[in-house]
Amino acid sequence: MAHSVKIYDTCIGCTQCVRACPTDVLEMVPWNGCRAKQIASAPRTEDCVGCKRCESACPTDYLSVRVYLRNETTRSMGLAY
């Protein structure tokens, strides 16, 4: 089972996460929801190694891209309500 990579609509289209990913999991796709007219997408999650470099590179303080490791759930991370 691969890790789950979630891209949220707070993405500003800066490409930092795409450049930080060592396994090319992420790519930019056209999107009209931000000034950059593009958003990160994760079409190759099976290649994700769970390093979370994309999270660290994100200038929106982890609000745009999140990597959930295989055994990680929103409940185990204290995010469930």
UniProtKB/Swiss-Prot annotation:
It comes from the Eukaryota. The keyword Iron-sulfur applies. Binds 2 [4Fe-4S] clusters. Cluster 2 is most probably the spectroscopically characterized electron acceptor FA and cluster 1 is most probably FB. It is a peripheral membrane protein. Its cofactor is [4Fe-4S] cluster. [4Fe-4S] cluster 1 binds at residues 11, 14, 17, 58. The keyword Transport applies. Its main location: plastid. It is found in: Plastid, Chloroplast thylakoid membrane. GO terms for cellular component: chloroplast thylakoid membrane; photosystem I. Its EC number is 1.97.1.12. Keywords: 4Fe-4S, Chloroplast, Electron transport, Iron, Iron-sulfur, Membrane, Metal-binding, Oxidoreductase, Photosynthesis, Photosystem I, Plastid, Repeat, Thylakoid, Transport. One of its GO terms (biological process) is photosynthetic electron transport in photosystem I. [4Fe-4S] cluster 2 binds at residues 21, 48, 51, 54. Residues 2-31, 39-68 form the 4Fe-4S ferredoxin-type domain. The eukaryotic PSI reaction center is composed of at least 11 subunits. Apoprotein for the two 4Fe-4S centers FA and FB of photosystem I (PSI); essential for photochemical activity. FB is the terminal electron acceptor of PSI, donating electrons to ferredoxin. The C-terminus interacts with PsaA/B/D and helps assemble the protein into the PSI complex. Required for binding of PsaD and PsaE to PSI. PSI is a plastocyanin-ferredoxin oxidoreductase, converting photonic excitation into a charge separation, which transfers an electron from the donor P700 chlorophyll pair to the spectroscopically characterized acceptors A0, A1, FX, FA and FB in turn. This is Photosystem I iron-sulfur center. It comes from Gnetum parvifolium.
